[in-house]
Amino acid sequence: SGRLQTLCYKADIEAALRTPGFAGFQLLDLHDFPGQGTALVGVLDPFWDEKGYVTPKEYSTFCNKTVPLIRFPKMVWLNNETLNVPVELAHFGEKALQGANIIWKISNQSGEKLAQGSFVKDLPIANCIPAGNIEYALSGIEEPSQLTVSVEVKEANNSNRWNIWVYPAKQKAVEKLPYIASTLDDQVMNRLEKGENVLLLLAPGSILPEKGGDILSLIH
């Protein structure tokens, strides 16, 4: 999907910008290729128009002359942990920025601000510029939640953001597990007609390897 493509480009570009000794990157075309066959893999269509799933403004949050970055050790956390991640900057603007104001914020899916902070940092023309650490105890997150961590550089008029997921460390007991089956037989159909929950897991070997059976074996 287009959103997955955007996330993949974001991850690749940010990885390049976090690389010490970074000397630039090249994207092999950004629009769909219509000649000698068709490759509908571009961020833009063959006429260099938007496709509707990402805007130039969003794309520039992670592909720009000044980009805030975070080194996340993981994107899924438990609420008995403390989010502690370093903030970095990649700055390749026309000149260095003196006393840049770097503002971070953590919010939930409702847009409610949970925490915020700031750093002041001189930004030379370079990457891997350390700004400081974001530290936030996740103990107040009682239900499975998606949080957004954003970092803004005021003087560069650019901000970047990432989604993380927080789950309770103590799992609730499941009162009644679903019925687990490997085939859709009469017994399964009877349970479904009664309103019961059924988890259908295909048995290893039930699908040919070339049809995805090799992946099925890995799952089991």
Regions found by a protein language model. Name each.
Residues 220:
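Conserved small/polar residues in nucleotide/adenosyl-binding loops
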Residues 162-183:
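Low-complexity, Pro/Ser/Thr- and charge-rich linker/hinge segments at domain boundaries
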Residues 1-99:
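Substrate-binding clefts and catalytic carboxylate motifs of secreted carbohydrate-active enzymes
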